[in-house]
Design a protein with these regions (language model features):
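Alpha-helical transmembrane segments of multi-pass membrane proteins
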Residues: 59-68
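Hydrophobic transmembrane alpha-helices of multi-pass, membrane-embedded glycosylation machinery
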Residues: 105-106, 205
Length: 271
């Protein structure tokens, strides 16, 4: 069911993407950058391998040291399962937030002609298209049982029917986490002030907490998913920093406004 929801989310985003077919943000560019993304691991350099190695090492260390104790704590304290922060975290990392975020910036771009909104919308599409299958492939390759299966931290069914078809054996890495971090990274990289960059990551922090607290994932699953989402989101934004129409976009910003007896916030999206 969950994988079908992600498929629907992906379809909605892709169907709406013709809104972006202006100023170079079209299928041709998407196809070129997607092929570049697929080829990227074959062209990794020393620092790329170092990052991957550190993430793997960190995941192993967390699995060996804190996964079980954190999971046990969550099982013993379930009373906040339906609390507002946990629910917000679940929604932000779920399949409904990407179409909503994409739709907001796509509609704003369509109404105002904002190049920045168009760029962000395009990058949200890429974040979904790249993150979902990448995460799923790793899940199938690892086949780790979720905490709620009660099989322990070291139960794996790699490249098996279970890991391919059964949600309960797709724990590593965290899919909600990788998707939420990828989207938050895209938003943060396009924001100007540091505090707005921080705000972009706040719902992701709730997603991480909710997945661990509800025993949907081990701590190491969340760590690896967050790293994966960050690397993908960062790579996407970097493609548009190098060249092309996005190079003139300077990001969106929100500033406080005070004037006479009125005050509020002003959102700025360069045209």
């Amino acid at each position: 069911m969950r994988n079908r929801l992600w498929a629907v989310s992906l379809a909605l985003v892709l169907c709406a993407s013709p809104l972006l077919a202006q100023n170079g943000y079209d299928f041709s560019r998407f196809k070129t950058e997607t092929w570049r993304f697929i080829q990227k691991p074959a062209h990794w350099k020393g620092d790329d391998w170092l990052k991957a190695g550190l993430v793997c090492a960190g995941s192993v260390i967390l699995a060996a040291t804190v996964d079980k104790s954190v999971s046990d704590w969550g099982f013993r304290h379930p009373k906040y399962d339906n609390s507002v922060p946990i629910v917000i975290g679940e929604i932000w990392g779920g399949p409904f937030s990407p179409p909503l975020v994409f739709g907001f910036f796509a509609v704003h771009s369509w109404l105002t002609g904002s190049e920045t909104s168009r760029k962000i919308s395009f990058e949200i599409v890429q974040a979904v298209v790249y993150t979902v299958p990448t995460t799923f492939l790793i899940k199938v390759a690892v086949g780790r049982a979720r905490p709620k299966e009660d099989r322990g931290v070291d139960y794996f069914r790699p490249f098996s029917k279970d890991s391919l078809l059964h949600f309960n054996y797709q724990s590593f890495p965290g899919g909600h986490i990788s998707m939420s971090v990828a989207i938050s990274t895209v938003l943060a990289k396009n924001a100007r002030p540091w505090w707005l960059k921080t705000v972009a990551y706040l719902p992701t922090a709730l997603t991480m907490a909710s997945r661990i607290y509800q025993n949907k994932h081990w701590t190491s699953d969340v760590f690896c998913g967050a790293a994966l989402g960050h690397f993908i989101g960062d790579w996407i934004v970097a493609q548009h920093r190098k060249a092309g129409p996005a190079s003139g976009a300077h990001g969106f910003s929100i500033q406080p406004y005070f004037g006479g007896s009125s005050f509020g916030l002003i959102a700025s999206l360069p045209l």
